[in-house]
């Protein structure tokens, strides 16, 4: 039993040993190639602190081209800022016993800049290295310039390798994430609609909600990186931010539906509205899956036949439900859930129409 527990622990701690990940292997290859090129160039040019070139090439190498461009830009700007501040404080006349004053001023100034913009977070580290690390006889200005040049070389190597060695574009990764998100939302809706008639699987629903939240977070980062690719003219098409925002709105409304379907309806409500919402739920779930397929295929999408009819039947059913005076005896909490569900359904329809437009804008955009 103990051996089995150890094996399970290793499996949980080292999942890569139990799962083949082609994207991970491609990334590892890019990192190795970038590091070896940087190492060889540092040796060839006899750079004084050549290890910074290698480290930068590795740090800049991200999962996609957009991420590498962003990392290279931020590291170079932060390094230049920190090196500049490190050099400027050396101009302050202090005695040998008060070198800490320069160090404190450089760290404080660079840390303040980081508080304004986290993209410059390497600035304090560079300022410290500029003031402390230089070899005897090497001026602070020379140390600062050396570090900036080496970071620039390492960043350039990382970007070039990202562009040429099994390149992965943030745009393509974003499309995959949004498609996966839409399929997760389709599964969420299926569980929600089932919850109108019988106790639902809340554990499975919670897992889908958590997974969809992670996909949204990843998509926000990928959208930023994809925008960097567009700025560098590596990817065409429209800006991806609107696609992510619209997908997020759809998710929020589906969570509202999940809250409104947390308990089965009593027989009198289920008899009047159950079949209507079942039909509507199947239509929306199918459309979410179709949107995912269209996004991955790079084509526009139109609602399936019967789409508008299912919403028309929904509106007619809700109107009949409101007009039925016998429903005034239903519990207030139940009525609140029913009308909250109806509101969320209308919002979903509007957001899905917007999402159709966003997917249409992405149609034909090169996937990289």
Where are these regions (language model features)?
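Short, charged/polar, low-complexity loop and linker segments
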Residues: 194-200, 225-235, 323-335
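Short, surface-exposed loop/turn segments at secondary-structure junctions
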Residues: 199-206, 230-237, 267-271
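Soluble C-terminal extramembrane regulatory/interaction domains of multi-pass membrane proteins
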Residues: 246-368
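Alpha-helical segments in soluble extracytoplasmic regions
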Residues: 203, 208-219, 275-285, 289
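Oxyanion-binding "anion nests"
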Residues: 215-256
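A transmembrane helix-and-boundary motif of multi-pass membrane transporters/channels
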Residues: 1-214, 357
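Amphipathic alpha-helical coiled-coil segments and their boundaries
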Residues: 174, 205, 236-239, 243, ...
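Membrane-helix exit/interface motif
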Residues: 88-92, 227, 258-262
